[in-house]
């Protein structure tokens, strides 16, 4: 028993130490295994900073785009449990809602959801329709997924640029540059609650409701968050 108390005391001391230096106990995020070319990374970061500067001055719009999904079994959140309390998310047949979303630092959001596997033609159609409703030159930041680099998108880029829509591709393996990653983390970790995973209907309704409320009732201070 004495040994057990000693181990517990050590854990408390470790926790106290980390809290005292400003550390937080949180989920460890995954990073891609690859490493981008230093030269390409430096060049892209410099160009991104230029776009950020123009956007902050109101000269352009800069959206950060990405795909993600919500799934009845893929994500199980943390939660506090009292001793003897059985907190759980019921297991059920896996259901998945795929999301393509774009957000800027002023919480302007555009996107769509689908139960289908994210097809390139849906992304293309969305961007094409989006290009008809621009108030100023608009840049959409994307990663290098094949769905963003397909032949049809390449063919339409000159037409989109005539309308004022420009695509900017991140360097490979650089999700930390995309604030849409912050959006997805907050969506799954805060706006979707543990009880929302009870059924797929509740989960997908909550997801769509949260996405529709971005910039209105739900906002992110991106200066306090990193992707």
Question: What residues fall within each predicted segment?
Answer:
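Short functional hotspots at interaction and active-site rims
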Residues: 1-227
């Amino acid at each position: 028993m004495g040994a057990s108390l000693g181990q517990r005391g050590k854990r408390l001391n470790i926790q106290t130490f980390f809290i005292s230096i400003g550390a937080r106990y949180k989920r460890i995020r995954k990073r891609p295994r690859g490493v981008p070319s230093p030269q390409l990374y430096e060049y892209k970061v410099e160009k991104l900073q230029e776009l950020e500067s123009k956007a902050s001055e109101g000269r352009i719009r800069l959206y950060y785009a990405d795909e993600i999904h919500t799934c009845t079994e893929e994500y199980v959140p943390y939660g506090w449990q009292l001793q003897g309390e059985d907190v759980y998310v019921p297991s059920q047949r896996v259901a998945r809602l795929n999301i393509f979303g774009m957000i800027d630092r002023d919480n302007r959001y555009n996107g769509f959801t689908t139960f289908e596997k994210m097809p390139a033609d849906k992304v293309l159609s969305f961007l094409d329709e989006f290009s008809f409703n621009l108030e100023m030159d608009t840049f959409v930041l994307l990663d290098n997924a094949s769905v963003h680099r397909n032949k049809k998108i390449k063919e339409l880029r000159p037409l989109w640029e005539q309308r004022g829509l420009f695509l900017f591709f991140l360097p490979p393996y650089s999700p930390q540059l995309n604030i849409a990653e912050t959006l997805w983390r907050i969506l799954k970790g805060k706006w979707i609650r543990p009880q929302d995973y009870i059924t797929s209907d509740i989960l997908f309704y909550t997801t769509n409701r949260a996405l529709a409320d971005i910039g209105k009732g739900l906002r992110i201070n991106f200066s306090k968050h990193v992707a």
